[in-house]
């Protein structure tokens, strides 16, 4: 696995590495932020992988807990038992200032074992899932680390680990479904006669897909930035245009397609963000119609000025195709956020920034102009 930059990794890289470690039956621990009080660099659901054979991958803080987390991970790798540790980082003299670490963080550290398999199988199928993990227990029969995974079809999968008790699982069904739909995470308390449980409800979504229709030079930089931002990138070359993995080393798939068949390469419509950049009006028109009519992709970015989109709509009208308002709402043209940079690099950054904002249901504006928390606080029990 690539650990040249083990700290600045995406959720996609974390999931891919989890799968690779499981395939290798590696001895590893996983640290997960389960609860935060006050401010913290990472929110619930953030993960760090700590394999025995090398450096950690990922981050659960801005660096202020590296030593303690590594020590906890080493202990879990030896014991194969999950543990939850609370770190009070409000004491700046003890932990150091200036790192964004001034909240109280609850951290689950557990062994990488078969309890992760149901989640990894779902992600491999481009589906979301929710893991339910007991992080505090007043029931002696239910240990910390007991886990059940709920998948999109409603199945609840167990493992060699103890699972979440059936009565608690029933109480958590709605929270699990909401977390799966939104990709949110948090702790829910389940009151039970045999002892209350605090359960970490961790909704995990597969990586968003960035579909680039076109294989000109400008697509290379968009593919590079898209992969760095955590997208799984597909480059679809139009008609006879040359494109391969060597030309697009950052893409996860490179395919050749007719523009009317570009929808065939959409694997997860609800999480696919398409950009049409073939620089051919006819091909872009055909691809746009296919994506809007044959898929539910929420975002289709179109390169070029507004006038070009007007020409494209006129061409569609000539074929008796009129875009509905819901279809028009899915089109973004000119594509990208206004960064004020017209260079190829600036344009690519603008495109990926907009796709990222749409994928996260964010406006894409300046944080200084927003009120409240930078990241939304989620109550999974609501």
Give the location of each predicted region.
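General small-molecule cofactor/ligand-binding pocket signal
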Residues: 234, 255, 332
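ADP-ribose/adenylate-binding Rossmann-like module
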Residues: 236-237, 273-284, 289-315
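Short gly/pro/ser/thr-enriched loop/turn and capping motifs at secondary-structure boundaries
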Residues: 67, 240-243, 262, 306-310
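Conserved SAM-binding strand-loop segment of SAM-dependent methyltransferases
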Residues: 252-258
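Segments forming oxygen-rich coordination pockets for charged ligands
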Residues: 2-252, 269-273, 315, 354, ...
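Short amphipathic alpha-helix with an adjacent loop that forms part of the alpha/beta core around
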Residues: 260-269
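Adenosine-phosphate binding glycine-rich loop
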Residues: 298, 302-382
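Thr-Gly-centered strand-to-loop micro-motif
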Residues: 145, 159, 213, 277-278, ...
């Amino acid at each position: 696995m690539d650990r040249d930059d083990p700290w600045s990794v995406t959720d996609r890289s974390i999931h891919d590495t989890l799968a690779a470690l499981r395939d290798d039956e590696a001895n590893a621990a996983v640290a997960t932020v389960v609860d935060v009080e006050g401010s913290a660099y990472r929110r619930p659901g953030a993960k760090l992988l700590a394999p025995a054979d090398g450096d950690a991958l990922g981050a659960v803080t801005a660096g202020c807990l590296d030593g303690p987390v590594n020590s906890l991970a080493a202990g879990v790798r030896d014991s194969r038992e999950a543990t939850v540790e609370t770190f009070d980082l409000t004491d700046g003299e003890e932990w150091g200032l200036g790192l964004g670490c001034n909240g109280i963080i609850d951290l689950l550290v557990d062994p990488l074992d078969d309890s992760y398999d149901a989640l990894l199988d779902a992600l491999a199928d481009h589906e979301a899932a929710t893991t339910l993990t007991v992080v505090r227990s007043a029931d002696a029969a239910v240990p910390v680390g007991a886990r059940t995974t709920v998948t999109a079809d409603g199945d609840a999968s167990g493992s060699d680990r103890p699972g979440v008790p059936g009565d608690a699982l029933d109480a958590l069904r709605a929270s699990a479904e909401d977390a799966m739909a939104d990709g949110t995470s948090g702790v829910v308390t389940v009151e039970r006669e045999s002892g209350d449980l605090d359960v970490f409800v961790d909704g995990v979504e597969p990586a968003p897909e960035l579909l680039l229709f076109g294989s000109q030079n400008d697509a290379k930089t968009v593919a590079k930035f898209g992969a760095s931002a955590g997208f799984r990138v597909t480059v679809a070359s139009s008609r006879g245009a040359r494109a391969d993995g060597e030309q697009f080393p950052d893409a996860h798939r490179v395919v050749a397609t007719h523009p009317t068949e570009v929808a065939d390469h959409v694997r997860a419509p609800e999480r696919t963000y398409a950009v049409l950049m073939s620089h051919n009006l006819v091909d872009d028109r055909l691809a746009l119609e296919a994506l809007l009519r044959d898929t539910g992709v929420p975002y289709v970015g179109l390169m070029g000025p507004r006038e070009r989109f007007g020409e494209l709509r006129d061409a569609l009208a000539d074929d008796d195709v009129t875009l509905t308002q819901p279809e028009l709402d899915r089109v973004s043209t000119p594509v990208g956020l206004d960064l004020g940079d017209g260079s190829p690099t600036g344009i690519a950054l603008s495109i990926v920034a907009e796709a990222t904002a749409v994928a996260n249901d964010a406006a894409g504006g300046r944080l200084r102009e927003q009120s409240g928390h930078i990241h939304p606080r989620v109550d999974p029990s609501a």
